[in-house]
A protein has these predicted regions:
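Hinge/lid segment of periplasmic solute-binding proteins
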Residues: 101-153, 177, 289-291
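Extracytoplasmic/periplasmic solute-binding protein
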Residues: 144-148, 153, 177-223
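Conserved N-terminal structural module of periplasmic/extracytoplasmic solute-binding proteins
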Residues: 2-105, 169, 282, 299-300, ...
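Glycine-centered hinge/linker elements that transmit conformational signals in sensory
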Residues: 180, 220-248
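Extracytoplasmic/periplasmic substrate-recognition and gating elements
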Residues: 243-245, 280-343
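Conserved C-terminal helix/tail region of periplasmic/extracytoplasmic solute-binding proteins
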Residues: 111, 163, 371-427
Length: 427
């Protein structure tokens, strides 16, 4: 499932048809006083996760007397417009998924999303939420929403291809590039290149593994996209493309299918990609594996790992605020998170939850919990929305024309300068 989409907040017209659709999105006709024996509708931009949401809805019905039914979208601009339209109607979604970073700040500043500071405080005290995750859900000192999921970004690989050529997961960048060279020498495409919606993936990975301080500074306007460290990363990416290590960026085949069929040997992705693999009939440990991508710069004190966490939210004027809040409180507990993690084969925000059936991922989760990684927020959430929009287009253009890297960086920097000219750098 490719569940990120291009930012389009404010760019998609909220039509009367959408508004009419929103009018029927809630589970009730107004504020209800009942908090049991009801079913909440969870609107989300993760349509392929509907079976997993439905399973959790049955669990919650048994545990707390509140069921949950998913309403999934697969097109992000349409979904965002739909949710925004609900801010201006009398009918609201009971629960909805969103994104951290600039998008969460925007709806928090509109005062339409429920303040969950009390849930966070209790969750941290009870050991159901890690203190380190709180910062990504904080706007002006207050918390909003709770973690829908957490994912660690690494490399998924076809174990049959690795075995064929006697390859094992790398622990250094030199080993990583050696694997790519060996695969290429046998006519095997090493890496999935991503498409326009995911064009930031290789950029963030290379920069995080080379200059993590610059990576973080870009997100706060304290570094420039034309700084030497950033330019060097683009040159490195260009070299990988020119060496034939990447798949065709215009290939529309699902990356899970490409990995399964051997069209590519490796796919960089979040740990949630496990669900795609298993849905495609592949088994972790036998058909595919997962490893953390080594730093380019081996002198860095810790391996940089990209962290992704998406929010589960409710509105201040939800149809039944008490029921929605009760659901959010339940969601963060191990009673909810263990089946949620197990069903998708992914990590959980709850430290008490263990990953089952995937030794590779469980090792990564354990290492992350022990502080062995330098966890960095995914670029999609870290970059301000207007800068991200420009970057997605620029990185996509670069993949088609690698020699244009300087032009593309200048384009992104122009968007960054425009944004930070009206915002405080470091915010």
């Amino acid at each position: 499932m490719r569940h990120w989409r291009r930012l389009a907040l404010g760019a998609v017209a909220i039509t009367s048809a959408l508004s009419a659709a929103v009018a029927g999105c809630s589970s009730g006709n107004g504020h209800s006083t009942a908090t049991t024996n009801i079913t909440l509708k969870l609107y989300n931009d993760k349509g392929a996760w509907s079976p997993f949401f439905s399973q959790l809805g049955k669990v919650s019905k048994t545990d707390i007397g509140i069921g949950m039914s998913p309403v999934g979208y697969t097109d992000e601009p349409t979904y965002q417009a739909f949710i925004q339209a609900s801010f201006h109607t009398n009918r609201k979604p009971d629960l909805f998924t969103w994104q951290t970073g600039g998008l969460l700040a925007e709806i928090a500043n509109l005062h339409v999303v429920t303040n969950t500071s009390a849930i966070w405080q209790q969750g941290i005290a009870d050991g159901d939420l890690p203190k380190g995750l709180e910062q990504y859900y904080t706007v002006a000192g207050q918390q909003y929403c709770v973690p829908l999921n957490v994912a660690y970004w690494g490399m998924f690989y076809n174990k049959h291809i690795f075995a064929k050529y006697g390859l094992t997961p790398p622990t250094t960048w030199a080993q990583f590039m050696h694997i790519a060279q060996v695969l290429k020498s046998h006519g095997q495409t090493p890496f999935y290149e991503t498409d326009v919606l995911f064009s930031f993936v290789w950029f963030e990975q290379l920069l995080a593994g080379t200059a993590p301080d610059v990576y973080q500074a870009l997100a706060t306007g304290k570094a420039s996209y034309t700084d030497p460290a950033v330019v060097n990363v683009m040159k490195m990416w260009q070299g990988m493309i020119n060496d034939g290590y990447m798949s065709d960026p215009g290939n529309k085949t699902d990356p899970g299918v490409m990995l399964k069929t051997g069209e590519v040997a490796m796919v960089p992705d979040g740990s949630w990609f496990n669900a795609t693999m298993t849905q495609d009939g592949m088994k972790p440990g036998s058909d595919y594996g997962y490893f953390i991508i080594p730093n380019v710069d081996s002198s860095l004190p810790k391996t940089s790992v990209i962290l992704e966490s998406g929010p589960l939210c409710s509105l201040t004027n939800a149809p039944d605020p008490d029921a929605s809040t009760k659901y959010l409180k339940w969601w963060i507990t191990a009673a909810a998170q263990q089946p949620w993690s197990t069903s998708r084969g992914d990590a959980s925000a709850n430290p008490k939850v263990s990953v089952t059936g995937d030794t590779d991922l469980s090792t990564v989760v354990k290492n992350a919990g022990q502080g062995q990684y330098n966890l960095l927020l995914r670029y999609f959430e870290a970059a301000p929305p207007p800068v991200l929009t420009a970057a997605l287009d620029a990185f996509s253009a670069f993949m088609v024309s690698p020699g244009s890297y300087m032009k593309q960086l200048q384009t992104i920097q122009a968007a960054a300068q425009t944004y930070w000219s009206s915002h405080s750098a470091g915010s």
